[in-house]
Amino acid sequence: MSMLKRNYVVETIRRAVMLELLAAGKRPDGRGLDQQRELKIETGVIQKANGSALVTLGDTKVLAGVKIATGTPFPDTPDKGLLVVNAEILPLSSPYAEPGPPSEEAIELARVVDRGIRESEMVDLTKLCLVEGKSVVTIFVDCNIMNVDGNLLDATSYAVVSALRTSKMKKYKVEGEKAVATDEEVPVPVATTPVSVTMARIGDAMLVDPNSEEEATMDVRVTITTDDEGHVCASQKGEAGT
C-alpha cells in the first residue's frame, strides 16, 4: 500500500471514530461539546519585559512578552501610537513545526490575534501619542508557541491580553517637540478586555476549544472576539489545516 493511500485510510478511520463519538455527545478527552479545557494564566514571568504572560490551555502553551519603545507614527494616524503583534511557533512545540522564517500558520495567528486586540480598541492608542506626527509609544508583543495541542488562536489571544493588561510603561513629559522619559511608570492605557472563543464543526457537531486531534478532522473553524460589553469585535473563519 502506498504511503498516500495509507494516510487516506488512516484519516478516514480517524474521522469515522470522531464522528461516532460526537454523535453520542462525547469527545476524545471526555469533555462536553461546549466545555473548554483547563485554562491557567501566569503573569510577570519575563523579568526584563514590560509585561508578560504564560498561558496554558490544556496542553497548548503560549508565552507572550511586551516590549515598549518610542517611534514615529504612521502618516495616516499621526495622533496614535503603534501596536505590533508577532508570533513564532517554536520547532520543538510540534512534530510539524519547522525552523526558519515564520510559517504561514504563525503569520495568520499573529494577524488574527492582532485584529481582535485592535478592533476591540483594547489599548487606547491616542493616549500613546507623545508629539503628534513625530513621536509615539510603540508596543511590541512577541508570542512564542511552546507546545501545540490545538486552538492556538484562543491561547495566544489570552496570552497577549493578559500581558498587555499587566504591562507598565515609562511616563513621558514633552519638552518643546521632544518627549523625555521620566522615572515614573504607568500602566498601558487599557480600555477593555477582549475575549476570544474558537469553535470547530466536525460533521454536524459544533464544539468549543478544539484540541489537535479534533482540529485534524474538523470541517470548519470559527473564532469570535468580543469586548467587555459583549459586542463582536472580530471574527475569523478557517478550514482544517489553515
Model-derived features: positions:
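Polyanion-binding surfaces on beta-sheet-dominated domains and ring/shell assemblies
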Residues: 1-242
